[in-house]
A protein has these predicted regions:
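Short, surface-exposed beta-edge/turn micro-motifs
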Residues: 1, 50-53, 67, 106-107
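Short beta-strand segments
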Residues: 1-36, 55-58
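Short gly/ser/thr-rich secondary-structure transition/capping motifs
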Residues: 36-38, 92
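Residues that form or flank phosphate/diphosphate-binding pockets in enzymes
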Residues: 38-39, 65
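Short amphipathic alpha-helical segments and helix-helix/interface helices
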Residues: 41-44
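Charged, gly/pro-rich active-site loop segments
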Residues: 60-125
Length: 125
C-alpha cells in the first residue's frame, strides 16, 4: 500500500491510498473493480490536467526508532491499452492475488516515471 498525491491544474492536492507494482523502473497503479467512479476519478482527472505526482510508502512501528518513509516524485501517465498496459496488469496481478480475478484489462493503469526519491528514518541511508 502506498499513497498517491496528485494536484489539479490549480494546485489543489488530492491524496488516496493505492495498490502498486514496480515494473521496468516505474510504478504501476491499478484502477480496479472496488466501488468507485472509474472514469471520473479525481486522481485520473488531476493527472490529465497536471501529471506531476508523488507516491509515499511508509512504515509505522510503536518503536519510533523503526519509523520511516520513502517518497517518489515523478510524472504520471494514464495507460489504457497496449503492451505497457498488459505488462502493468500482469505485474499488479503478480503482486496482488485479489487482482487475478478482476477484469483489469478494460480499466486504465496509472504509470509513474520516477524523477526523484527522498527517504527518512529506517529507509534512509
Amino acid at each position: 500500500m502506498a499513497h498517491l498525491a496528485t494536484a489539479d491544474a490549480n494546485g489543489r492536492p488530492h491524496v488516496v491510498p493505492v495498490c502498486f507494482a514496480h515494473m521496468d523502473g516505474r510504478f504501476c497503479i491499478a484502477i480496479d473493480e472496488k466501488p468507485k467512479r472509474t472514469r471520473r476519478l479525481k486522481r485520473l482527472r488531476n493527472i490529465a490536467e497536471n501529471p506531476s505526482v508523488a507516491l509515499v510508502f511508509d512504515r509505522y512501528d510503536d518503536d519510533w526508532a523503526r519509523l520511516g518513509w520513502v517518497m517518489v516524485q515523478g510524472t504520471a501517465a494514464i495507460i489504457s491499452s497496449g503492451s505497457e498496459h498488459e505488462r502493468g496488469v500482469d505485474a499488479l496481478r503478480e503482486r496482488y492475488e485479489q487482482y487475478r480475478s478482476m477484469a483489469l484489462e478494460g480499466r486504465p493503469v496509472i504509470r509513474v516515471a520516477v524523477e526523484k526519491v527522498v527517504s527518512w528514518g529506517v529507509f534512509s541511508g
